[in-house]
UniProtKB/Swiss-Prot annotation:
Highest taxon listed in the record's lineage: Bacteria
Source lineage: Bacteria, Pseudomonadati, Pseudomonadota, Gammaproteobacteria, Lysobacterales
InterPro entries named among the record's database cross-references: Restrct_endonuc-II-like, tRNA_endonuc-like_dom_sf, UPF0102_YraN-like
Record organism: Xanthomonas axonopodis pv. citri (strain 306)
Pfam families cross-referenced by the UniProt entry: UPF0102
Name listed for the protein in its UniProt record: UPF0102 protein XAC0764
Coiled-coil residue windows: none
GO molecular function: nucleic acid binding
Family: Belongs to the UPF0102 family.
């Protein structure tokens, strides 16, 4: 991935984290990599564990970043979340949800989609 694109992705992820922290969520871990998938942000929201996918598109002609979270991507996120919970059994009993932070435009405008999809939808 080109350096400028990597920097943009890191900046959008940091902005998404700040947005969620302002809303009261607390970071558990960022950029957790597992075979077949990556979890951008894992956060606590009260008693719930939240797996957050951050998606950026400079141009939203074909839909914003959230439009790119198709069934294949959702399935990868669910698998990565299962692997995360297997590695962190103390968190496995918590209720979980999947959120998406959609970033589009220049400068990026963020939209938080709470409970964007459910694991059993995949």
């Amino acid at each position: 991935m080109p350096a400028a694109r990597q920097q943009r992705g890191a900046a959008v992820e940091a902005a998404a984290r700040a947005l969620l922290e302002q809303a009261g969520l607390r970071l558990v871990v960022g950029n957790a990599n597992y075979r077949g998938g990556e979890l951008d942000l894992v956060m606590h929201d009260g008693p719930s564990l939240v797996f957050v996918e951050v998606r950026y598109r400079r141009d939203d002609r074909f839909g914003g970043g959230a439009a790119s979270v198709d069934w294949r991507k959702r399935r990868k996120l669910v698998l990565a979340a299962q692997l995360f919970l297997g590695a962190h059994p103390a968190l496995a009993a918590l209720p979980c949800r999947f959120d998406v932070v959609d970033a589009s435009g220049e400068p990026p405008v963020l939209h938080w989609i709470r409970d964007a999809f459910r694991a059993d939808d995949c």
